[in-house]
Structure formats: C-alpha cells, structure tokens
C-alpha cells in the first residue's frame, strides 16, 4: 500500500502536518475554494515575475491559518529576497493581489515569507527546477543526475525521481526513474516529502514525481 498511496496523505498527523489550519461548518466549501485561489494567486505571481531568475528557489509550500478576523499566509521559499523588490514593493503587490480575491473585506491579511535553509531538499522546488530544464529541451537523464546532486547538498537520506511521457521526443511514451539512497515508502515513521509536477514540452506533457527521504522519527 505504501508504494501506491500519496506519501503525504499516508503520513498526515504522524510526520506530516496540514497545510491549512481553520474550522468551518456550513461555509467549508467556500473557505476551501478561497484557500485554493490564494495559493493559485501566489503561484501565478511568482511565475509571472520571477520565473527567469536563474537562482530562484521557488515556493516549497503555502500554509494558511485563519482566525475570526485574520488570515495569516506563510510562504516557505528558497530565496525570499527575490520576492522582496525595492522597498518591499514585491510582497506588498502580492499581498494586494491576494486581498482582492478575498470575499470579505473586513478581515486582515498577514503575509509572511519564511526562508528555507536548503531549498533543494524540498521536492516541489526540485520538481519545478527539473520541469524548467525539460521545457528547455535538456536531456532528461542529465537533468535527473543534476537534480540528485543538488538534493544531496541538503543532507537528505534518499531521493527518487521519476519522469513519464515522451522522453527526448520519442514516439512511444515510457517511464524512467533514478534513485539515490533509501526511500522507505512503507515505513510510516519515515519523513518523506513528495511532489508531482507536470512539465509542458513541445512533445507533450511530462509527469515528474519526486520523493525525498529526510529522516526517521
């Protein structure tokens, strides 16, 4: 079962925490949709303004905490300085964009940038970097090898990368993967982070999956 199920949901409440902290009764679907819009707004802003930065670490995750009159958004990123333009205009513009999609104006919005010490130890950041390379028509084996080298700098215990689709423009789609170290998917106490990301290439969509084994509790 551990081989097929989503590693994050499998370990939720044990080694993984929720990404949203709030309670809603009748308004659950509305609040859930609002969280989705907030995350999409942040991702869109980053892709639009900072995608061309060669050393940008990307966004690892966005955590949303709600109170009666306060929405707190915490953005975990590899290089927060690249999100903060001159005099903090970058984060202020992002905050304004998020405020515009909120259904109620009487709630305060607090946005915080949290720096990740070793960004390439985060699967989402690594998967997006792989996608950028594949979309630039870099060979997939070379891309996977380079990604593993970057991840190993983050003091991880194991990593597995899988890419599926028309690799290198082949007529028949296939699946290729590479692994370094241990990735015990069936061990619940193992802290394994996971991400799926789709790369849009000229040959079609390539599915990228990244598993990173941090440590055991």
UniProtKB/Swiss-Prot annotation:
Keywords: Chloroplast, Plastid, Ribonucleoprotein, Ribosomal protein, RNA-binding, rRNA-binding. Pfam families: Ribosomal_S3_C. One of its GO terms (molecular function) is rRNA binding. One of its GO terms (biological process) is translation. It is found in: Plastid, Chloroplast. InterPro entries: KH_dom-like_a/b (IPR015946), KH_dom_type_2 (IPR004044), KH_sf_prok-type (IPR009019), Ribosomal_S3_C_sf (IPR036419), Ribosomal_uS3_bac-typ (IPR005704), Ribosomal_uS3_C (IPR001351), Ribosomal_uS3_CS (IPR018280). GO terms for cellular component: chloroplast; ribonucleoprotein complex; ribosome. It comes from the Eukaryota. Residues 46-117 form the KH type-2 domain. Belongs to the universal ribosomal protein uS3 family. Part of the 30S ribosomal subunit. This is Small ribosomal subunit protein uS3c. It comes from Marchantia polymorpha (Common liverwort). The lineage of its organism: Eukaryota, Viridiplantae, Streptophyta, Embryophyta, Marchantiophyta.
